[in-house]
Amino acid sequence: MKKLFNFIASLAVLFSCDTFAININLAADKSNLNIGDTLELQVRVSGLDDNAAPSLGVYDLNLGFDATLFSLNAVHWGDSVLGNQLDLAGFGSLQESTVNGSWLNLFELSFDSVADLDLLQAGDFTLFSVLLTAQAIGEGNFSLWINSIGDASGNELSIDEPNGLAVIVGGVEVPEPSGFLLLLGALAIFALRVRNLQYPR
């Protein structure tokens, strides 16, 4: 009976941890692109409860990318649909982005009150989007490193390990001429030769 109780208790703890697991992950708008194409990377948080504590109030992240394959274009803060979930009351937020070689550091601190963040913030949303341009052929690997992340009061949140992803950059494809165009070209050359035979210079 005691073993059964311990087993049930262990399952309860396991499911409880899974239920309240908070994740920050990378998502790309494409997995294959050509030189000159633009890639959009989104960094998303999930696992928070809608309109309830804990909410997200501050984060400090490093985004790793291959600087030989991609050049940084822009950083867009917030969710394109839900808006910036760290600026719910319109007071703004402290935002900083710094590039150091193949690392992009992104920091944001909300100026909203604890009550506004806990009561108004969504459970799943995009923190920011990064736009990059492909500039060389190869496989680009992206990684995310969490320096720190805190709730509305600044207390540290427990976060699962972020995912990584890879994107393939290929060369620009040159379209091959269609069979119909090749046939027209051959007919034109044949007609020109026949004409030269009929009307020699």
Task: Identify the meaning behind each predicted range.
Residues 45-47, 83-138:
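Structured beta-strand segments within beta-sheet-rich domains
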Residues 135-149:
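Contiguous beta-strand segments of beta-sheet-rich domains
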